[in-house]
């Protein structure tokens, strides 16, 4: 017999750094999910990723208090900020540039994000990443 779905939730947790403190603990606890079990499973799955990289995670939880999780790749903005060596995007992106990235770096980011992007090929994924860069005030050369 199939498990009865109780709901889904989305969290953004740093890779390898899930712990029961807020915001993870309360978000899971109020839905009846075993917090320590989630933290151990999440940290085990993300141990090969860069520590501290924000990982969007979709958690599907069931009425029997079990859960499954899908860990996605870090946001394109995270990769772009890292490639451009900036702390944050521009406050006025159309008028201000905070850094530059090369087309090769954009391609590398698009390849890393490909499984989570809504694109058919690498060129489409690059356009999505270019749009993110433009909206952050990062120039592509």
Curated annotation (Swiss-Prot):
Q: Which residues form a coiled coil?
A: none
Q: Name one Pfam family in it.
A: Ribosomal_L11
Record key words, sorted: Methylation, Ribonucleoprotein, Ribosomal protein, RNA-binding, rRNA-binding
SUPFAM superfamilies with a match to the protein in the record: Ribosomal L11/L12e N-terminal domain (SSF54747), Ribosomal protein L11, C-terminal domain (SSF46906)
After translation, the protein is modified as follows: One or more lysine residues are methylated.
What's one GO MF term for it? Answer: structural constituent of ribosome
Q: Which domain of life is it from?
A: Bacteria
Task: Give the UniProt entry's GO cellular component terms.
Answer: cytosolic large ribosomal subunit
Q: What does this protein do?
A: Forms part of the ribosomal stalk which helps the ribosome interact with GTP-bound translation factors.
Its family?
Answer: Belongs to the universal ribosomal protein uL11 family.
Quaternary structure and interacting proteins, as annotated: Part of the ribosomal stalk of the 50S ribosomal subunit. Interacts with L10 and the large rRNA to form the base of the stalk. L10 forms an elongated spine to which L12 dimers bind in a sequential fashion forming a multimeric L10(L12)X complex.
Q: Spell out the protein name for this chain.
A: Large ribosomal subunit protein uL11
């Amino acid at each position: 017999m199939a498990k009865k779905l109780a709901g889904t939730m989305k969290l953004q947790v740093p890779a390898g750094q899930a712990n029961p403190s807020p915001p993870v603990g309360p978000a899971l606890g109020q839905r009846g999910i075993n917090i320590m079990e989630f933290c151990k499973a999440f940290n085990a799955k993300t141990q090969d990723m860069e520590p501290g990289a924000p990982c969007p995670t979709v958690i599907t939880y069931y009425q029997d208090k079990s859960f499954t999780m899908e860990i996605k790749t870090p946001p394109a903005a995270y990769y772009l900020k890292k490639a451009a060596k900036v702390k944050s995007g521009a406050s006025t992106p159309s008028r201000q540039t905070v850094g530059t990235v090369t087309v090769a770096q954009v391609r590398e980011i698009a390849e890393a994000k490909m499984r989570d992007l809504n694109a058919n090929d690498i060129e489409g994924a690059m356009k999505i990443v270019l749009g993110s860069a433009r909206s952050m005030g990062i120039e592509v050369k």
